[in-house]
Swiss-Prot record:
GO molecular function: structural molecule activity
Gene Ontology biological-process entries: symbiont entry into host cell via permeabilization of host membrane
Lineage of source species: Viruses, Riboviria, Orthornavirae, Duplornaviricota, Resentoviricetes
Compartment list: Virion
Organism: Bluetongue virus 10 (isolate USA)
Homology family: Belongs to the orbivirus VP5 family.
Origin: domain of life: Viruses
Described purpose of this protein according to its UniProt entry: VP5 protein is one of the two proteins (with VP2) which constitute the virus particle outer capsid. Acts as a membrane permeabilization protein that mediates release of viral particles from endosomal compartments into the cytoplasm. Permeabilization activity is probably negatively regulated by VP2 and is triggered by endosomal degradation of VP2 and exposure to low pH.
Name of the protein described by the UniProt record: Outer capsid protein VP5
Region entry Involved in membrane permeabilization, spans: 1-42
Length: 526
């Protein structure tokens, strides 16, 4: 269990502070007294913001815009018309989620119509039965199948799809890790197809990169969702190449409504089981290798990262199948005896026993302090049910403080065995507000508002799904806490933009670009 409380770094904080830190040492060691006099006269005791500070630092310290402005790119490709929502705006998030759901449903239906025969041959006719149960015509009462049997079929089919995706990822990763001469014919073909997709993705990212401005956090946008999914999908389960409708594991699950059937019959919400359409590490790698080929080992790392996300989903569905369904069956039988219900139907009371509170579902839950809400907000990030972990990430942008803490696990109907360690969300939240109250940088008004906020529960502003693994999410959170350079890039612009950038850095990660400047050469030609 860990806890970190740290001051946030911004561009334009007092340069006096900067000159007493590592920067000052570099001034004396790198350039000498002449440059030192120049720096002191130019900077004085004033505050230098943004790009000017960046330029002066780069002259003094020899860093490529040194400890300052570079190109910061969000490790996510946004589809046309998509934008990162403000975490404190539930309406903005809700609208985006609904539009995305409708688009995905339409695209998944195309996959079912196009590949139905191949999919049912590969994964069994149960998929069709599950789809008909949800969307098909009403049958005679005698022909209606037992609901519990249908639930088991949906869970088994979903597990089959995830296992197939996991094994294909493993084959591709193994092929990429082998020497080219040692690959089999199938592996050569697989690697060649994957390389073609990466090249297409690389050229699309390159076009976007050329048009980027230097001084803000950037998003790679403009690819249509169909092309993006086809280009970034490592191993399509059915269909190959750059087809516009590729039968990925995610698309097959959506097309046959497996999660919806499981939710409708058992009350178990599996909407958190997702994998990134495009693995963030592949974007980071592509941005690094601008004018050269990406080595096979780097591609293998990205494939293995995606495989980890798929394996997490496999473990989650196995947890539901082995731990939860037997309990479900037992409670179902008890309810039948009490209520005298017929065998074929699952009573709604059974489903309600497996509902869990919204704030404990595996998502990013967003809260704000009741007063000074624009500045003081925090995320409660909950892992998958089989891991049963969570962490707290709080920000006070008024006094530039960040607080990260691992929390104790929750008890609920879908969780794993409990371990008593760590603190609760309420305890972490109260300590976080105490920081703001006791900080020397807090104004009297801000401190009073935080005292009032501490006495009541924070405002719950809704939840968001995350596509990456919980481990990757936690690593992103810790990077936001530790990485001064990243903080400088996300804490710029209007307050709502800073919150968007923080959310983007948490959900996807950020790659900061910039090459080192040859300082002696720079000064010689100045």
């Amino acid at each position: 269990m860990g806890k970190i409380i740290k001051s946030l770094s911004r561009f334009g904080k007092k340069v006096g502070n900067a000159l007493t830190s590592n920067t000052a040492k570099k001034i004396y060691s790198t350039i000498g007294k002449a440059a030192e006099r120049f720096a002191e006269s130019e900077i004085g005791a004033a505050t230098i913001d943004g790009l000017v500070q960046g330029s002066v630092h780069s002259i003094i310290t020899g860093e490529s815009y040194g400890e300052s402005v570079k190109q910061a790119v969000l490790l996510n490709v946004l589809g046309t018309g998509e934008e990162l929502p403000d975490p404190l705006s539930p309406g903005e998030r809700g609208m985006q989620t609904k539009i995305k759901e409708l688009e995905d449903e339409q695209r998944n239906e195309l996959v079912r119509l196009k590949y139905n025969k191949e999919i049912t041959e590969k994964f069994g006719k149960e998929l069709g039965e599950v789809y008909d149960f949800m969307n098909g015509e009403a049958k005679e009462v005698e022909a209606v199948e037992e609901q519990y049997t249908m639930l088991c079929k949906a869970v088994d089919s979903y597990e089959k799809i995830l296992k197939e995706e996991d094994s294909k990822m493993a084959i591709l990763a193994r092929a990429l890790q082998r020497e080219a001469a040692e690959r089999s014919e199938d592996e050569i073909k697989m690697v060649k197809e994957y390389r073609q997709k990466i090249d297409a993705l690389k050229s699309a990212i390159e076009i976007e990169r050329d048009g980027m401005q230097e001084e803000a956090i950037q998003e790679i946008a403009g690819m249509t969702a169909d092309v993006l999914e086809a280009a970034s999908e490592e191993v399509p389960l059915i269909g190959a190449g750059m087809a516009t409708a590729v039968a990925t594991g995610r698309a097959i699950e959506g097309a046959y409504k497996l999660k919806k059937v499981i939710n409708a019959l058992s009350g178990i919400d599996l909407s958190h089981m997702r994998s990134p359409k495009i693995e963030p590490t592949i974007i980071a790698t592509t941005l690094e290798h601008r004018f050269k080929d990406i080595p096979d080992e780097q591609l293998a790392i990205s494939v293995l990262n995606k495989k980890t996300a798929v394996a997490d989903n496999c473990n989650e569905i196995a947890h539901i199948k082995q731990e939860i369904l037997p309990k479900f069956k037992q409670i179902m039988n008890e309810e039948k005896e009490i209520e005298g219900i017929e065998d074929k139907v699952i009573h709604p009371r059974v489903m309600m026993r497996f509902k869990i509170p919204r704030t404990q579902q595996p998502q990013i839950h967003i809260y704000a302090a009741p007063w000074d809400s624009d500045d003081v907000f925090f995320f409660h990030c909950v892992s998958y049910h089989h891991r049963n972990e969570s962490f707290f990430l709080g920000f006070d942008l008024g006094i530039d403080v960040v607080h990260f803490e691992d929390l104790t696990s929750h008890w609920h109907a879908l969780g794993m065995a409990q371990e008593a360690s760590g603190r609760t969300l309420t305890e972490a939240y109260r300590e976080f507000l105490n920081l703001s109250i006791s900080s020397t940088f807090s104004s009297a008004i801000h401190a009073r508002r935080m005292i009032r906020s501490r006495a009541v529960h924070p405002i719950f502003l809704g939840s968001m799904h995350y596509d990456i693994t919980y481990e990757a999410l936690k690593n992103n959170a810790q990077r936001i806490v530790y990485d001064d350079e990243l903080q400088m890039h996300i804490l710029r612009g209007p307050l709502h933009f800073q919150r968007r950038a923080i959310l983007g850095a948490l959900k996807f990660g950020v790659k900061i670009l910039g090459d080192k400047i040859d300082v002696p050469l720079f000064l010689r030609n100045a």
